[in-house]
Amino acid sequence: VQVDVSRRYVIAHPGDVDAAITFLRDVQRSLGRVPFIRNLRVTGDTVRADLAVDVPFLGQQLLDFESRLEMHERGARLIATPREGRAWATVAGDGTVNPAPVGSMIEYALEISVFVALPASEKWGGKAFEKMAQATAEKAIERMTLEFPRGVAAAAQAERV
């Protein structure tokens, strides 16, 4: 089962453009409150974490991912590192800060891929199971991605304090 999701978000930041860029580039601060990102670690330009994903019929699984952090003039991007194995995730994103009438706006493009190997199925029952697992996984990841802007927005609003 492989599910690929791409989403775009616009998230308010209470600070000016420079403060929002600093926030965005600090992965611990900007992504630390996203509920499905666990065990977030940053070493140099390498970001590692676990993606908490509800896998059909297996429950919640922690799929590790690794991305490379790259700065650009108006923000930062995460470049996904290819993975292998029976279960994996990749996370990529590009955040750009723009001025707003009050504070700043972060435009974020998020791309997540999740892969979980299921036992090979050659009979019609197994094929039906695969289709059901694929549909269930797609719905679960859709729900999961709704948490992303909420988590980043909560972290951004905490900057007011």
Spans of features found by a protein language model:
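Short, surface-exposed coil-to-beta transition loops
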Residues: 4-6, 61-66, 87-94
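Hydrophobic ligand-binding cavity/cleft-lining segments
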Residues: 1-50, 54
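Beta-strand/loop substructures that line and gate deep hydrophobic ligand-binding cavities in soluble
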Residues: 83-138
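Glycine-rich portal/gate segments that line the openings of hydrophobic small-molecule binding cavities
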Residues: 38-86, 143, 147
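A short, structured loop/turn motif at beta-sheet edges
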Residues: 14-17, 41-45, 70-75, 96-107
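Short structured motifs
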Residues: 5-6, 35-36, 50-51, 77-81, ...
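Solvent-exposed residues in well-ordered beta-strands and their adjoining turns
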Residues: 10-16, 52-56, 70-72, 98, ...
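Short, highly charged C-terminal tails/helix-capping segments
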Residues: 142-161
